[in-house]
Design a protein with these regions (language model features):
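Short, well-structured N-terminal submotif of metal-dependent ribonuclease cores
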Residues: 2-73, 80-96, 188
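Active-site neighborhoods of divalent-metal-dependent phosphate/nucleic-acid chemistry enzymes
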Residues: 2-14, 20-26, 112-166
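A residue-level structural signature of the nucleotidyltransferase/glycosyltransferase Rossmann-like core
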Residues: 34, 66, 128, 166-167
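Acidic active-site catalytic centers that drive phospho-/nucleotidyl reactions
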Residues: 38-40, 152, 171
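Hydrophobic/aromatic ligand-binding patch that stacks against planar heteroaromatic rings
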Residues: 59, 158, 174
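Mobile, glycine- and charge-enriched loop segments
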Residues: 59-67, 71-75, 80-85, 93, ...
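Short loop/helix-cap segments at secondary-structure boundaries that form the rim of catalytic
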Residues: 173-180
């Protein structure tokens, strides 16, 4: 599901840091902003662990904010929701839940709630953004500068390419990356 992109009139991200080494409260994102959204925000909202994340996604759904979710974050969300459902069913152990589930394809085939949750996610109307080779190269450059792991760097590479003025995440490592205005839920 894709929406219309940010205006070509938006200014490019500056090369100098716009934010300090900490995040701003998620509720402070200004109306009309284009926001790259990390998986953890989606999970906290889905699991109702953060009313601030729920309210943030409601702002995106209403069109007040323009939420962008890079495809790797969508894949992470699917994976996380599968594991959450399997845990709720008491089908997997906590030690290595992904391995436990991968060894039981019969259980994977029986999972169903995560699909409904993904359909609800897509119905919000967030822009799902595919990534290309240039994004991967940019993510590697970001990794060299910041020490972030791959998917975190991909989130920032997409945010930079799309000129998103904000990044929504609960990840403190991302909040320390320079050159990005990072917003985090204050209720976690």
């Amino acid at each position: 599901m894709t929406g219309s992109g940010p205006s070509t009139k938006k200014p490019a991200l500056p090369s100098k840091p716009r934010s300090g080494p900490s995040a701003v409260p998620l509720r402070s994102v200004r109306g009309g902003a284009w926001v790259a959204i990390d998986t953890n925000i989606l999970i906290y909202a889905n699991q109702r662990r953060s009313p601030e994340c729920v309210a943030f996604l409601e702002r995106c759904a209403s069109g007040e904010l323009q939420g962008v979710v890079p495809l790797p974050m969508v894949a992470e969300l699917v994976h996380a929701l599968m594991l959450i459902e399997a845990r709720e069913n008491n089908w997997i152990e906590r030690a290595n839940p992904a391995r436990s589930l991968s060894e039981r394809p019969d259980l994977v085939r029986r999972l169903s709630r995560y699909e409904a949750r993904m359909r609800e996610f897509f119905a919000i109307g967030l822009r799902i953004e595919a990534l290309g080779a240039a994004d991967v190269i940019e993510a590697i450059r970001i990794q060299r500068e910041t020490g972030l792991l791959t998917n975190d760097a991909l989130l920032l590479a997409a945010a930079r390419r799309l000129n998103c003025e904000a990044v929504a995440t609960a990840d403190k490592a991302i909040a320390r990356a320079s050159g990005f205005k990072v917003y985090a839920p204050a209720d976690l």
